Structure formats: structure tokens, C-alpha cells
Amino acid sequence: MADVFEFELEGHESQASPQRHAYHYDNCTEIMEDDHMYSNVADGQISAPPPSSSYMEDPMMESIQLCASAINPPNVRVGPEDFQLLKVLGKGGYGKVFQVRKTTGSDNGQIFAMKVLQKATIVRNQKDTAHTKAERNILEAVKSPFICDLLYAFQTGGKLYLILEYLSGGELFMHLEREGMFMENVAKFYLSEIVVSLEHLHQQGIIYRDLKPENILLDAYGHVKLTDFGLCKEEIEGDQKTHTFCGTIEYMAPEILMRCGHGKAVDWWSLGALMFDMLTGGPPFTAENRRKTIDKILKGRLTLPAYLSNEARDLIKKLLKRHVDTRLGAGLSDAEEIKSHAFFKTTDWNLVYARQLEAPFKPNIENDEDTSLFDARFTKMTPVDSPCETNFSLNGDNPFVGFTYVAPSVLEMMNKGGHGGISVAHLASSMSRAGAAKSPRKPGDPETASILHGGHSNLFGHGPNSEAPQAFGYGIGSQMTTTTAGGAGIQQPYQSFSGGYPEDDAMDTSTPRASESRETTTGNGSTTTTRPSNVGSSASTPIPLPKRVM
């Protein structure tokens, strides 16, 4: 697939205040009691509270039994031995993604996706280590029906484990590969749910920065779930800008390429590129190599096929405005500008938020273990969690102290299963930072901000010495790399274009472009794979369905 980059530009974010991360979890359980009612305060005679037996006899008081099973309910702490490997969903330099079945606890028998990461590979780079911990924090903090959910996180001496919900609908990329392109009503469904998911991230002060078909998964009902938060930027308020050079080239906004600072509006450019991709068969700007692709993004004319509706053409043109100030969604109202566009005039946004719109494609799943919508190149592999050559102490200098996590939803399930009367909220606060993560973040509060959104990572990228093919949907995919074709490293982000932007007006045409190529870069170098460009046709001409090549 396409190249993904991340560069921290000196002189900008390097001057930001250092972030502190709360990775230590208390092992105690806090029990809150109501204030006692005291009498005779006026004359200085304060009666002692009644003995505890009096409370137990009061039918209005709730009994709380303190016992080992209540404070430390069984099966809260999990490990690799609690999961049965079923299938390989993906593989990369940092590790593998498996389909697994839980074999213990109240969720015994449930199917999950298990991402296994090699510590030795991650700790080679201090930044990778920090990003990995921050990525896990984002997965914990951001809860939305349109975001892939994290259920457990744990570690061994040599590996990190993330247990995510299994999304049997596969990647949107695979469906586009099969169909070639989508009809407008189909694209509208997916775009509406993507808009809502980006809106949620923006409201949390997060820029996504890597929207593309590979990072969009479908659940068993055909609804959208975003995954891969490795390129996110947190703590962005209002029109605040950041200066990291990152993203997947074909979907990157011009202001990222120009290194002039960017904000949340880069996600709306990517939405426009994705919309174009869905409706035409490929991204709007592609070429035979990376440099020419960037040149087209910065200076090329946008070519729109004639078969698109006026509303679709107008929305694409307004999203792909090179001048940020004129781009739809760049204002303070953010997603509201896009939701009110004529392309979505028939969309009931209340139904979108409630996930009550009927999906155009409902996966034909035989059972919970069905992996037919994932790449057979992976699922035919024998699932083996390979042994580690290097192990790290789980105490002392362990760089991943505090990585363990159990979702509140899991604790709630266990509580209903009869593990005592301790409040689930107390259990959650003792096992993780879930309580703090759900608290409103106050602008300008660095400690709270770091708890909520600890940073960005390349946790979901493939690491060095990775093997092709790569998995995309669950994130062991394209690495943020500085490797170019032939292995030459990029020392600086693209900077050859020094002039102003060309006109933003798109050129409508019915002339299809020739197929162009996208580069796929791995840690060992890069290869080039061909993907179709936008396909144009007249309204009376049958629309060819191009075949995507992965």
C-alpha cells in the first residue's frame, strides 16, 4: 500500500510543554461512604455514629461485603493463556494480529482480535516506546460506537498484547477492491458514519491524520469502525496547529506537505480524497512515484468524471480546497459544515448517530469465527505466537509499566456475574485509568490532557524488517517510514514547491485518466503497486469497474 510518514519538525512541537503520562495504577479499591448524621452539635455533644450492625439492619442501606472475590474478582487479570489462537488476521514487523477465543472468565467463548507486539522491536527506538504506550492510552480514552474498542491490554516479559473487538466485516479497502467503486448512495452511508467518527475525535481534541480505506473496518452489521490511531495528534483546541509531517501520501493535505502547520481540517481533505476514491476507483492525485504524487497534490488540477452528481462534485471540490480557510469543515463549526451540505440532504443524522441506518452491505457471516472477509494470504497461515528471544523485567526498569487494562464493560459483566457488591466504578479505577479517562478534559491542564490523550504512536505500523504482505485493518500495516525507493532515506519533508497554490477550481471531464501507481514502502525498501486512477465516463456510457491491486 501507500507510504506513511512521520517527521517531527524542529522548532515547532519540540517547544511544547513536556507531557506527563500516568501509567501507574493503584492496586487499592476505594469505598466511598455517605456522611454520618450527627446530633447535638449546638451544645458540643456529638453522638458517635451507630455501630455497623445498625446499618445492616436498616432495609434502606445496601450491604457491601468486603472479601477477596469482591475486591479482586477472578479472571480480571488475563494473559496469553486465556486466549485460544484461531486464525492469523495480519502480520508485520512489530508482531501479528490473531483472531482468538477467550477461554476463561465471564466472557468465555467470545471472539476477539489479539494484537501481539514484540517489545524488543519497539524499544529499539525511544520514541516508538513512548508512542506505543500513548497509543494504548488513546484506545482506552476514546470510546465511541464508531471506534474500534479495546477490551484488554496486558504484557509478558517479551510481548505486549492488545485485545480488540473482532470486526468480522473486514476492511473497507477489501470491499472497494472487490467492487471497484461504490454508487453514490453506498458511499454516502459510509461517508456519513466516517464524518461522525471524525467529529467525535475532533471534539476530544484529536486530529486523526490517516484516513484511508485500509483504516476503516466494518462490523457484523456493516457499520463503520475506525482503527489505527498511530498518527493521531492530541490536545488540539479550536484552530490550533501542529507541524508533524505524517500521513499516507495519497490522502495527505497540502498544508502537511508544505510544512506550514495544520489543524483538524486535514481530516476533511482526507475525507474528500476518500470520497473521490469511493466514487471513482482511486485517489484524486496519484503518479508513478512519490515525488510526482506530491507535486500533483500541490499543483495538479482536480479531474472529476461527468457521471458524478452535482452534489457529489460540489462536496469533493469543497473538501479538496488547497487553501485551508476555504475548505469545508475548516471553520469552528467543524463537521456541521459537512453534515449540512446538499450531498447529505436526505441523510437523517439522528439515525446515523444511533447506527440505525441500514447498511448497504451486511457481511454474510456464517458464525462468530468467520474470517472470509479478511485476506486469505493471512488466514491460511498457521496461528502461532512465536517465542521471544528477549525478555524484559515486569518490574524495575520495565518501559511498559501500567500497560495492563481491563475495559469497564468487562468489569460490569463480571459484576453482574456475582463477584460481590463493590461498585464497578471502583474496580475500574483500581484496575485502570478509566475513571480519569472519562473525565472532561480541561483546556490548558497538561496533566489531565496527558491522561486522556497521551500522544501518538506507530503502534499500528509494521516495523523494520517486515515481511510482505502486510495486514491493514487491525493496524500492522504501512509503517511511518523515511525509506524511499531503493532505500535512500528522506532527510527532510518535501520542499521543492515554493510557489502559491494553483486555482482550487476542479475541472469536470469525462475523459478517464490512465492507471497510475502508488508506492508501498517497507522497512527493507519499497515496491510499487498499481492502483486504478479515477475513472470517468459520460452519463450514457456504462461505468467500468476497475480492479484494485493490493
Swiss-Prot record:
Cofactors, names only: Mg(2+)
Domain Protein kinase: 83-344
Organism expressing this protein natively: Caenorhabditis elegans
SMART domains, per database record: S_TK_X (SM00133), S_TKc (SM00220)
Cystine crosslinks: none
EC numbers: 2.7.11.1
Cited Pfam families: Pkinase, Pkinase_C
Location of the active site: 210
GO biological-process terms attached to the record: determination of adult lifespan; nematode larval development; positive regulation of autophagosome assembly; positive regulation of gene expression; TORC1 signaling
Subcellular localization: Cell projection, Axon; Perikaryon
Region (Disordered): 433-466, 484-550
Encoding gene (name): rsks-1
Family matches, as PANTHER family: RIBOSOMAL PROTEIN S6 KINASE
Post-translation changes: May be phosphorylated on Thr-404 by let-363/TOR.
Record domain AGC-kinase C-terminal: where: 345-415
Its biological purpose: Serine/threonine-protein kinase which regulates mRNA translation. Negatively regulates lifespan and resistance to starvation, oxidative stress, protein aggregation and P.aeruginosa-mediated infection. May regulate these processes by preventing the activation of transcription factor hif-1. Required, probably downstream of let-363/TOR, for the establishment of the proper number of germline progenitors by promoting cell cycle progression and preventing differentiation during larval development. Regulates germ cell size. In addition required for sperm production and embryo viability.
Protein name: Ribosomal protein S6 kinase beta
GO molecular function, one term: protein serine/threonine kinase activity
Keyword ATP-binding: yes
Substrates-to-products reaction catalysed: L-seryl-[protein] + ATP = O-phospho-L-seryl-[protein] + ADP + H(+); L-threonyl-[protein] + ATP = O-phospho-L-threonyl-[protein] + ADP + H(+)
Observed effect of gene inactivation: RNAi-mediated knockdown causes an increased lifespan and resistance to starvation, slower growth and a decrease in brood size. Causes a decrease in the number of germline progenitors. RNAi-mediated knockdown in adults causes increase in lgg-1 positive autophagic vesicles. RNAi-mediated knockdown in a daf-2 e1370 mutant background results in daf-16-mediated up-regulation of stdh-1 reporter expression in the intestine and a synergistic increase in lifespan.
Recorded consequence of changing residue 115 to Q: Probable loss of kinase activity. Enhanced axonal regrowth following axotomy of PLM neurons
Transmembrane segment boundaries: none
